[in-house]
A protein has these predicted regions:
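Extracytoplasmic catalytic/substrate-binding loops of multi-pass membrane glycan-assembly enzymes
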Residues: 2-18, 28-40
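Juxtamembrane "helix-exit" motif on the non-cytosolic side of transmembrane helices
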Residues: 2-5, 44-49, 77, 97-107, ...
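Short hydrophobic/aromatic helix or loop-helix immediately within or flanking a transmembrane segment
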Residues: 28-55, 59
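Membrane-interface micro-motifs in multi-pass membrane enzymes
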Residues: 34, 86-128, 151-156
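Transmembrane-helix motifs of polytopic, lipid-linked glycan transferases
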Residues: 59-81, 122-126
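Membrane-interface transmembrane helices that cradle and orient dolichyl/undecaprenyl
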Residues: 120-139, 173-175
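Membrane-interface alpha helices of multi-pass inner-membrane proteins
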Residues: 138-154, 159-160, 165
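Perimembrane helix-loop-helix junctions
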Residues: 159-188
Length: 188
C-alpha cells in the first residue's frame, strides 16, 4: 500500500502547490514553526508532476522508518534496555508500526517526519554518548540537531524525551541526575 499511485487530501495540496507555483502553503509551513519542512517541501515540489510521483516520497519515508528501526535497535542495546536481544528487536518493530509512524510512510506530504525522529535521537545520542567530542561541542551539536528536528515537525522533535526516558528510566542502572539535567536543558 505504501508504494502505490494514490494521494491523500494533504498530498493534493502539495500537488497543487507544485503545479501552480502556489507559495502560500510554504509560507504557512514557515509561519507554523516548520521552516525546514517548508524548505524540504519546496524542493520536493520540483519532483511532483502527477499523483504517481508521490511514490518517491513514500519510498523516502519508508527508508527513513527502516533507518529509525535500526537506530532504535542499537539505541536500546546501548541503553541496556531490559529483555535482551528479543526486546531490542521487537520494541523497534512495535514502535515503527505505531499508527502515527505508519502514517508517515503512507502519506507523501509527511515524508521528512520520520527523519525528524532520527534527528531527535541523534541529538540525544550526541549529547550523552559522543565522548570523543568536548562537552561544549556535544551540547552545541545536540542543540542544533534538535532544532533541525523541531524545524521539521515539533511533535516528532519531542521524541528526544522518549530517548531520555528509555535511557534514564527503563534500564537497571541508577538515575544520573547530572545527565538528566543536561537533557532537560537541551530540550527546554
Amino acid at each position: 500500500a505504501y508504494i502505490g499511485t494514490y494521494g491523500f487530501s494533504d498530498d493534493y495540496s502539495t500537488y497543487f502547490a507544485a503545479n501552480l507555483s502556489h507559495t502560500n502553503l510554504i509560507k504557512w509551513d514557515v509561519m507554523s514553526g516548520r521552516p525546514l519542512y517548508a524548505a524540504l517541501r519546496y524542493i520536493a515540489q520540483n519532483f511532483i508532476g502527477s499523483t504517481p510521483d508521490f511514490t518517491l516520497f513514500r519510498v523516502v519515508s519508508v527508508l527513513s522508518i527502516i533507518s529509525l528501526g535500526c537506530y532504535l535497535f542499537f539505541f536500546l542495546k546501548r541503553a541496556q534496555f531490559p529483555g535482551g536481544v528479543m526486546a531490542w528487536c521487537v520494541t523497534p518493530v512495535l514502535l515503527c508500526c505505531l499508527p502515527s509512524i505508519a502514517l508517515f510512510g503512507a502519506w507523501a506530504t509527511c515524508f521528512p517526519y520520520a527523519t525528524s525522529i532520527l534527528l531527535a535521537g541523534a541529538s540525544y545520542s550526541t549529547l550523552n554518548y559522543c565522548t570523543k567530542l568536548r562537552e561544549i561541542s556535544r551540547f552545541v551539536s545536540s542543540v542544533v540537531l534538535l532544532a533541525l528536528s523541531f524545524a521539521i515537525y515539533q511533535p516528532t522533535g519531542m521524541a528526544f524525551a522518549l530517548f531520555m526516558l528509555i535511557d534514564n528510566c527503563l534500564n537497571d542502572s541508577q538515575l544520573k541526575y547530572k545527565k538528566i539535567f543536561k537533557d532537560v536543558i537541551v530540550i527546554a
